[in-house]
Amino acid sequence: MGRLFGTDGVRGRANADLTPELGLAVAVAAAHTLAEADRSHPPLAVVGRDTRASGEMLESAVVAGLTSAGANVVRVGVLPTPAVAFLTAEAKADIGVMLSASHNPMPDNGIKLFAAGGHKLPDEIEMKIEAAVEANTTTAWERPVGAGVGRVHDLLDGADHYVQHLVGTVPHRLDGIKVVVDCANGAAAEVAPAAYREAGAEVVAIHAEPNGLNINDECGSNHVAALRQAVVEHGAQLGIAHDGDADRCVAVTADGDEVDGDQVMAILALAMREAGTLTADTLVATVMSNLGLRIAMSREGIRLVETKVGDRYVLEELRASGLALGGEQSGHIVMPAHATTGDGVLTGLHLMSRMAGTGRPLAELAAVVSPLPQVLINVPVGDRTVGAAAPAVRAEVARAEAELGDAGRVLLRPSGTEPLVRVMVEAGTETTAREVAERIAEQVRTASPVS
């Protein structure tokens, strides 16, 4: 079998790729692996899910796997991914399990594991779990009987604990702010409106009626058209959109203009520096963040550290360097002082808190970043490595970088999952960016044509 765990856990088509049998096997392997690491007590697991219909099926399989291996389970029901991480820490659990495919379409689902404290599961533990599943050794372990079988407890007030935690982190009350929140018919449907109201905001919730089938369906952080319209119609100061598991946050201004993760990071970085909480005056972002963010942060005296694409790499850099803020252009924002993973509702609260504290509209705050025009071309290739590394391609990239200088940049990277090479160019004008990107893309096509 191929690699089971990707950068965001196990993902696949529910009941096709990600079957109940696989969910059970992963859960059994996780429970046994943790028990072997610490035999002083039976493992304790927190299990949550988003609103996908398949979540109920997978939850049953995972809970059965955990308890059959002797682990006790706290079942928290439908909650955001960061809430499951938070409750894993609160319960002093050995592992957290979130059943979600985040922003993916409804037919997909996933299994994301958290370690004690709600942190990312260490790679070595993940590899042991994967090896056990792949070798099919999960059926060979001795099964506990009698009192050794794990028990299940349903936590009914987990959402309340989480909301109180979030609201307690906010520097300024949100009284007087009217916000439209798009809950993506997902895990934020109850929690996000509750948190924003508890903090003082007037809330209009849309796409907050999940039925198991409508999660991320033309709504949420990847589809903001309805949010833009609702903000204008309701005369709100801003709109906030989350994805299916509420680990992302993007916003729109009172006029309906989108504010992406780069701009949100810049707003929060300036607020935190002003409060003296931006460690080393440093922000962590990925290489996909717009050059406009780097230019803005340099102008403001804030250092920008770049990582590979993926919020896991942002998290790793934040923890390794003891930094206080990082994220992605897509809206994954991480504030380690308050959360162990990207938290969309937390981000929304702090974004509105900055508006309340300064009295400035979102559009004015977001203007600190002037994104450069960006062109992205996905080039189909026969071989991703050849397409990205051929001498003629590298020469064209070098020529482009010399032309653009400090006024633009080129990012060339093979896709991790598809036979594509992604060519991204930022420049002073869209015309220049497109011309440069097309030149490079043509060299990529020539170097590795599709057979």
From Swiss-Prot:
Activated by phosphorylation. It holds the Pfam family PGM_PMM_II. The active site is at 102 (phosphoserine intermediate). Its EC number is 5.4.2.10. The modification Phosphoserine is found at residue 102. The keyword Magnesium applies. It comes from the Bacteria. Mg(2+) binds at residues 102, 243, 245, 247. Catalyzes the conversion of glucosamine-6-phosphate to glucosamine-1-phosphate. PANTHER family: PHOSPHOGLUCOMUTASE (ALPHA-D-GLUCOSE-1,6-BISPHOSPHATE-DEPENDENT), PHOSPHOHEXOSE MUTASE. This is Phosphoglucosamine mutase. It comes from Salinispora tropica (strain ATCC BAA-916 / DSM 44818 / JCM 13857 / NBRC 105044 / CNB-440).
